[in-house]
Amino acid sequence: MTDVIGESTSIDLDDKYQAEKGSFFFTGVQALVRVPLDQMRADRLAGLNTATFVSGYQGSPLGGFDMEIIRHQELMVGQNLVHRSGLNEELGATAVMGSQVSSVFPQQNYDGVLGIWYGKAPGLDRAGDAIRHAQYAGTSEHGGVLALTGDDPANKSSTLPSASEFAL
């Protein structure tokens, strides 16, 4: 008789963040958490020593993003990933902008820093000035910035119905 099940393999729930090959399943928020980890793996293969700095304002619809990073903090430490919640969206965006100017200092700890800002659409409105200045300042040679914005058109968790298309 032919064995149709195949060999037993063990699966660890942290594979979605740690495995470098193979198939694994995760939610959209978990996929966003994996993005900086994959980027830093690619950087290391290219001979770069990089880090990631994540900041934004907690709350839905992207509230699960920061909670997922915090939930798996022990995995992030070895990956040079630092998460600091902002007091508001604007301060989070300003902190991410600061991660890009590290290259101007003579003694750098990293070749580059990936900055990730997150917030919902009303927060994007609030952070607009900081984000505009960050765009003009640019990023470091081996850094970059990713902005994650969650919309709330049904006004489930915001003070007003919101969408980010126009602000972006």
Predicted regions and their residues:
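Thiamine diphosphate
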Residues: 1-168
